[in-house]
Regions:
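Charged, flexible cofactor/metal-binding loops and thiol motifs
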Residues: 245-282, 292-297, 301, 512-611
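Conserved ABC transporter NBD signature motif
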Residues: 62-75, 344-353
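P-loop NTP-binding/switch modules centered on Walker-like glycine-rich loops
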Residues: 55, 191, 195-268, 449-451, ...
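A short, proline-enriched helix->beta-strand linker immediately N-terminal to the Walker B motif
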Residues: 176-180, 444-448
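The feature captures the beta-strand-to-loop junction immediately N-terminal to the Walker
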Residues: 39-41, 321-323
Length: 611
């Protein structure tokens, strides 16, 4: 008997007089220890199927089926959701939330054993675990989820953790239920490539060690190829193709699956070009520190951005990549004036640009706009799209009020929406459509530089392609410069003419995108590129088998921050932080490129990769 058996599942949503059929006649099974991936675009019904299996459909939804059974009941299944912050209580420590789950599961297990026992052997089983037992079990689960400093982490709140750590905490909470089936709904969306690989490797390891089945839902074909043994492809609420990972990725039968694979393969196309040598933005030696809590009475200094300099030219896209917490978003907020740097300066077309607190004018603010990562959080759910797009016009007064409605409707058409969408609310749109609205709002005051912070991280490959194509077209028509921030290396490669790789608050390598991708000079850049997920199962599984989970923190401020993870570390790396060595269009922060290491350089010296 299969661990999970679903036959002819149909899910309908009722909205006033309308009925929407989200899932139609879906059938599949999952065996013990098997990893099954469900792929498809946003809105294809993947998450709805998972929620129906777990009995978590919202009010107004109705599921019908011939069979939807989990061997042993739903208590044998657990679910890891896409956004861990939505399911973690921000006002309760991680340790308390984990211990609560352990205690509840223990009570239910004891109750079942007592009910099922015929000879009374289990009737004396305790109803509660002691605090020491809870602590021990919590640390064991955190270790299983790949968290080494469990005691320290249990005292922290969810908002104090990085995205990767929050996802590991949710995984530990799910494992507390001792599931035989783990449903993972987009578990690595919006995580950087190195953390993605670590989470996926951890899931595979747990599946093997516990003989636990995993039902993996993702719009990212690289994630599916990396982990899944068998793949189901969904479109418009139906399964259109099923087969082994090898069959689906190397010999797809349906045109829809072929189109998905073409979209994933097309992500790596190089299209970014330099179009001007006229400088738009100049950043000089920007530094930003934050004081964060370290225990109850002490604070420690976090060096978020360290001595960063860069230039962005008219009509250019400069790509910014790096893992979570490296300082990308902090730098973006400094550029837009939302944060004030501790030191350094910004110049816009040769004119000093202060922060908003230091008196940046409305005209200066208008010239630099930002598109935020979470479009749902950045759009007011109480306002219509028309009201949202009117706000920047009202603030900057760039148009006559009588022309606002016409400009709003024209802008919606420009970003691929319809004029009639102006009077709808944000909840009526898909994720890709909401991101188009966010971009439209940023374009309303006619900026000259657009800061894009992870604009497509949570979107499937086909919607990603549409958004990126739209951004390129807008750039071509208006000559806008982009500061494009992403953890997705293939997206940055597709958009950028130049790229900067950040680690621990500073640049470790900059250069033309093609040069950096084809011939990385810094060991960290090489690590990032090696961690990129491939939509080919043979490559993906081979790569993940060699992943090691790094537990070292970046080194102290006086040394190279990458030294604890570097395979080329030298004695000087432990004593001093390297500056950026410049060679034509390229810069690299590594002592391997110093004169002391490579020798004196005469006229015409040409540096090559030292790794």
């Amino acid at each position: 008997m299969s661990l999970l058996n679903v036959q002819n599942l149909t899910v309908q949503f009722y909205n006033k007089s309308e009925i929407h059929e989200a899932v139609r006649n879906v059938s599949f099974s999952v065996e013990s220890g098997e990893i099954v991936g469900i792929a498809g675009e946003s809105g294809s019904g993947k998450s709805t199927v998972m929620r129906a299996v777990m009995g978590l459909l919202p009010d107004g939804a109705e599921a019908s089926f011939e069979r939807c059974e989990i061997a042993g009941g739903r208590q044998k299944a657990a679910m890891v959701f896409q956004d861990p912050m939505t399911y973690l209580n921000p006002s309760v420590t991680v340790g308390r939330q984990l211990k609560e789950t352990i205690q509840v599961h223990y009570r239910r297990k004891a109750k079942r054993m007592k009910t099922d026992s015929r000879d009374g052997e289990n009737r004396s089983m305790r109803k509660r675990l002691s605090e020491n037992e809870l602590e021990s079990r919590a640390l064991e689960l955190l270790d299983m989820a790949g968290i080494r400093k469990g005691k320290e982490l249990m005292r922290q709140y969810p908002f104090e953790l990085s995205g990767g750590l929050r996802q590991r905490v949710v995984l530990a909470i799910a494992l507390a239920c001792e599931p035989e089936l783990l449903i993972a709904d987009e578990p690595t969306t919006a995580l950087d490539v190195t953390v993605q690989r670590q989470i996926l490797e951890r899931l595979r390891r747990i599946s093997v060690e516990m003989n636990m089945a995993v039902l993996l839902v993702s719009h990212d074909l690289g994630v599916i190829a990396t982990l899944a043994d068998r793949v189901l492809v969904m479109k418009d609420g139906q399964i259109v193709e099923t087969g082994s990972a090898g069959d689906i990725f190397y010999a797809p039968e349906t045109e829809y699956t072929k189109e998905l694979l073409r979209s994933a393969a097309g992500k790596s196309a190089l299209v970014g070009k330099m179009v001007s040598d006229r400088e738009t933005l100049k950043i000089e030696k920007i530094t930003k520190n934050f004081r964060i809590a370290d225990g109850m009475f002490h604070k420690k200094e976090n060096n978020a951005v360290n001595n960063v300099s860069l230039r962005i030219y008219e009509g250019e896209t400069f790509g910014l990549v790096g893992e979570s917490g490296c300082g990308k978003t902090t730098l973006a907020r400094i550029v837009t004036g939302l944060l004030e740097p501790d030191s350094g300066a910004l110049h816009y077309k040769g004119v000093p640009f202060p922060s908003l607190k230091k008196g940046r004018t409305k005209e200066q603010t208008r010239k630099i706009q930002m598109v935020f990562q979470d479009c749902s959080a950045s759009l007011d759910p109480r306002c219509t799209v028309r009201e949202i797009l009117k706000e920047p016009l009202r603030i900057h007064k760039t148009e006559d009020p009588g022309e606002w409605d016409e400009k709003i409707e024209d802008m919606l058409v420009h970003v691929g929406l319809q004029k009639k969408d102006a009077d709808k609310y944000p909840y009526a749109f898909s994720g890709g459509q909401r991101q188009r609205i966010s971009i439209a709002r940023a374009l309303m005051p006619e900026p000259e530089l657009l800061v894009l912070d992870e604009p497509v991280s949570a979107l499937d490959v086909t919607i990603q392609g549409q958004i990126l194509q739209m951004l390129r077209q807008i750039q071509k028509e208006k000559g806008i410069s982009y500061l494009f921030i992403s953890h997705d290396l293939s997206v940055v490669r597709r958009m950028s003419s130049r790229i900067g790789v950040m680690f621990a608050g500073g640049f470790v390598e900059t250069g033309k995108t093609k040069q950096v991708y084809e011939d990385p000079w810094h060991p960290y850049t090489k690590e990032l590129l090696a961690a990129e997920l491939s939509p080919e199962p043979k490559k993906a599984k081979k790569r993940i088998s060699s992943v090691t989970e790094e537990t070292e923190e970046p080194a102290r401020k006086a040394s190279c921050p990458y030294a604890p993870r570097c395979g080329y570390v030298m004695e000087c790396c432990r004593k001093e932080r390297p500056g950026l060595y410049q060679f034509g269009d390229r810069e690299v922060a590594c002592f391997l490129y110093s004169e002391e290491h490579t020798g004196k350089r005469g006229a015409g010296y040409r540096m090559t990769s030292q790794i």
